[in-house]
Amino acid sequence: TTEKGYLAVASNKGDIRMFDRLGINAKTHIPALGEPIIGLDVSADGRWVLATCRTYLLLIDSLQKEGKNEGKLGFERAFAKDSKPQPRRLGLQPAHVAQFQHETKQPLSFTTARFNTGIDSTETSIVTSTGPFIITWSMKKVIANRKDPYTIKRYGENVMADNFRFGSDKNVIVALPNEVNMVAKRTFQKPTRESIAGPATPKRARSGWSSRLGKDDIVNSPY
């Protein structure tokens, strides 16, 4: 919901509906684009809708930029049939997906993505996780179509839940299987083979085994 009480509802079929209040038909309906939607978040002002699918995120701009409803949100007035918003797909680069899966031996599976929130604060970042990795996207870089919009941090255990500290996008609250931590976003790194592999453990050092993806390795990638 937004700060004005507008509602966004998603289904396991993958479609999204926007309402300005309960008990009426949706003002805007965005048809299914692929996978089921497993989580949904909305910016406080209602401008942005963030949908989580298993292997990617969808960022939707609900502000109407033309026509008779110019300046209105999709929650307030219906989009014209030929001008419905086109979601931005936020995903990991195929090489990073392959390295993630090589490290975890598990398929990509995002937890519900969230905006940073706070009183009178603007959404500037997005956070989600998959396995032992936390990923944050910069809204500014996403909107500018930058090629490097996300950074990562790896843990030794799977991340159970994550969210930004209220009122700031500088710290992320991380729930692990047996503890809850707060980590500074500045410790996140650009995804590289080294940052995805994480620090070497004594076991790895003794065995001489490398977790880096080799040229002869075969991975099961959805791409």
Protein language model annotation of sequence segments:
Residues 57-63, 161-222:
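Blade-level signature of beta-propeller repeat domains, shared across WD40, Kelch, NHL, RCC1
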Residues 1, 7-11, 49-53, 118-120, ...:
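Conserved beta-strand element within WD40/beta-propeller blades
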Residues 29-33, 153-156:
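Surface loop/turn motifs at the tips and blade-to-blade linkers of beta-strand repeat domains
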Residues 65-68, 103-121, 127, 135-137, ...:
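Long, low-complexity intrinsically disordered regions enriched in Ser/Thr/Pro/Gly
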Residues 70-111:
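A surface-exposed beta-alpha-beta supersecondary segment
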Residues 4, 12-27, 59-74, 137-147, ...:
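Per-blade loop-tip surfaces of WD-repeat and WD-like beta-propellers in eukaryotic adaptors/scaffolds
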Residues 1-2, 41-45, 96-121, 158-169, ...:
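Structural signature of eukaryotic scaffold interfaces centered on beta-propeller domains
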Residues 13-16, 55-57, 132-134, 178-180:
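Short coil/turn segments within WD40 beta-propeller repeats
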